[in-house]
Every structure is written in structure tokens, then in C-alpha cells.
Amino acid sequence: MLTDSLFSYATTRHAARSPVPHSTEIAPPESPPRPGHVPPRPERRAWVVLVMIVVFMMISYADKAVLGLAAVPLMEELGIGKSTYGLISSSFYLLFSLSGLVVGFFSARISSRVLLLAMAALWAVAQLPVLLVAAVPSLIAGRVLLGMAEGPAASMSMHALYKWFPTGRRGLPSALQIGGAALGTAVSAPLLTWLIVDHGWRSAFVALTLVSAAWCLVWPFVGQDGPFGEERKPVRGASRPPRAAGPPLRALLTNGTVTGGILSAFGSHWALALSSAWLPVYLQTQMDMTATGASSVVSGVSVVSLALLLSVPAYVDRLKRRGVSSRRADGIPQGLAVLVAGGALALLPFAAGGPVQLLLIAVAFGCHAVALPLHYVTTATVVPDGRRGAVFGVVAASGTLPGLFVPYLTGRLVDGAATETAGYTAAFVLSAGVMAVCGLLAIATIHPERDARRLNPAGASVPAPRQAGVSKPVAQ
């Protein structure tokens, strides 16, 4: 999903928070930048907040990764099979989507600063049950609580981040926020594996508890809501400016751009759920790697994701500032990333030779990450600021649904097959098919400029990009 804020933003006061309007009158979405228009540069404070949010996401994904890294010794100590382990892993997502949805609808009433602090505090508490009693029920209880607390993390931290960065400057910050996930896995995998191998798997859970608590101590001093996308209190005696009539929430959620973004996120999170729960186990049991070797591969995959997250969205921002449409810059790449990752995953079970397998693993579990920041960017293009938190909550809740069943389904397929190898083959081919369908549908349905004009015909105009040497807007 590097984060927080020590900034001295001299000219910006703390933005007033307002509840979701009871009427249908809401501020229109921010228009995509006009060709040749350069959005205002974010103030220095925004970058401090960004750093804290990246760290927030690093901790979040380390919490997710620790169970997979500890899976082999944990299954051996507790004497559980792969189906039971898959159930424990899936339990993380039992309340994950629901909590993301609920918190999203309250995000306009509660400061992002408070929401993020509450989440991180619960992360620390959620690691305690397994430390007190190492058993399947305590593992499930801790993972359910952790999933509930982490469900809103990506969408709400992105919502908080967008309060600091204007339209046209959000691609790189979005990528860094999501990059915190890849960076968290890349950094935490070798460190947590070292703790697991040398000090037992419980030590990794203790370390994550302490890190979450430390973040909670720093955030209240530096966390703050930003100036963009929040309603300001009018000056006393001044008339409130007219506001555009906004579309109903149902129309926002069912337009092609938001639906396509959900599909690309669904395919990406399918791969993410599969890799978080099963990639370390697959590397150790099917490719005969040590725990340390497996953690190195997991870190390498995260580095691939991070490199793409840092390069692709930044390039996308530059394209849009040059007049390239959001569909071409944001929409097609996110669907294509999921499609390519699915293709690599389909080939993985049939590849011969370690280097080829490692390359396919890097593509299958690394490339899909590009879809995660870009689907938020395309969604924000068509959604009014006053409803962005709620829509982000729905998008996150829908897109992350694979985590609820993919780990358990994979465990059942592996346990139920004639051999473990056959089980993994079935799981990977099935996953590849789902990812391919999601990627293709995302490419076909995401049209940000078109949908923004349809949803806000009376609002601010959404200019179409112009091709070089052409004076007329290009039809979307």
C-alpha cells in the first residue's frame, strides 16, 4: 500500500473535515490535468506524510507475510496439514473486506490521522493471541483481528495521501504507497526468516508487535490531514459557492472505470494472496530451497514489484501531463499487468530448470503489482472528492476478496491431488485463468475520461487529450 508527516507547511491550515453530505450535491471529481497543464507541486510536508504512510504499508505487508514465512516450522510444530494451514491463512480475510467497506463510509466523518493510528494499534494487539497460546484457534483469532484492522489500510492510507497531492501528481505517491507493500516484504522477509530460523517462529511475531507499537508512538506527532479534496468552512458571512449535483453512489460504483479497476485489483490480489500464503512453502517443498533461500526469492520478487511501482506510475504521470489519455496511461497498463502475470503463472508448473522457474515466479508474482496504484488513480478520476473515501472502501473490499478463499482453496487442491506437484499445478493454472480474465475485462472497461463526462455532465469539464498537431479533442 513511507508515510507521515513532520512538515512545516507554512501556508496550509489543517483542512476541516465534513461528513458525507445528506443531499446529492457534492463536489465534482477533480478533472484530469489538461494537456500542457502542470499541476501545483506538493508542499514539503506532503513528502513527510508520504514517508510515514510507506512505513505504515511496510508494516502491514510484513504482518501478512510472516505467516507464510513461518508456515513450514509452524505446520510441523502444530501437526497440521496444508488445508488447515490454508484455512488459517484465509481467516485473515474473514473481516478484511467488510472492515474496509465500513471504515470507507466513515472516512468522511473521522480524521485519516485517527483511523490510521487505530489500525496500527490493533495490528500490535493482534499478534498477541498466538504468543500466549500456540494453537489453531489462537492463530485464527489473531489473524481475523489482524485482517479486520488491515482491511481499510490500503484504501484509507491512499485516501489520506490524496489529501496531500493534487490530481496529476498522484501517480508516483500512489506507487510509493503501494510500493511500501513490496518494500515491506523485501525488507522483512530476510529479517523475519532469520528470526524464525535462529530464534523460533514466535520471535517474528514479537518483532512485528514492537514495530507496530513504535509506529503508533510517532504518528500522532507527525500525522495530519492535507489540503486537497476536503471541504473548507466558508468565511463567516460569505455565501457558499454553488455545488454541482453529483451522481448517486450506485452510478459511481457501476461505471466501467470503477468496475474495471475492481477487476484489475481482484486479479492482482488473487496473485498476492497466493504468493503470501504459498510461495515460501512452494519454494521449500517443490524447489528444495532452504528457508533462507526461499526468503531471498520472496525478497527478489518484491524488488521486482518495487522497481515497477517506482517506474511505471511515474512514467504514467509524465504521459498524462503531455496529454495522453488516462485510459491509455492508467487503464490499459493495469489490465495488461494482470494479464501478463497470469500468463507467466500458467507456464510456471510446466517450466524446466531453476532459472526459468525463477524468472516466471518474478513475472507472475511481481508484475501484477502495477495494477494496485493505477486502479486507485483511475477510480479517483471519476469519483467526487466527498465520496472518494466511501468508493475507495468499496473498491478495496471488492478487490481484496480473493484473500478470503484463495489460500484455503489452494490448500484443498494440494491436499486433494494425487501428488503435491499436481495440486500446485491445478492451483496455478486456475489462478492464471482468473487473472487473465480479470486483466482482459479491465482493459476493455476502463475509460476514465468518458465515464467522468457521463457521470458529471453539468460539472467541471473533463478535457480530452490532444494528439500532437491536432487541435480537436480526441474522442474517448
Model-derived regions, located:
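Residue-level signature of mid-helix packing/kink "hotspots" within the transmembrane helices
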Residues: 65, 93-101, 151, 185-186, ...
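Paired small-residue
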Residues: 126, 137-145, 355-363
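Conserved MFS/SLC helix-loop-helix module at the cytosolic interface between two early adjacent transmembrane helices
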Residues: 98-134
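Helix-breaking motifs and short loop linkers at transmembrane-helix boundaries and internal kinks
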Residues: 79, 111, 132-138, 166, ...
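Cytoplasmic helix-loop-helix junction between adjacent transmembrane helices
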Residues: 142-181
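Juxtamembrane intracellular "pre-TM" segments in multi-pass secondary transporters
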Residues: 35-42, 226-262, 463-465
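Helix-loop-helix hairpin linking two adjacent transmembrane segments in secondary transporters
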Residues: 176-227
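Extracytoplasmic gate region of multi-pass secondary transporters
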Residues: 67-68, 256-312, 372, 376, ...
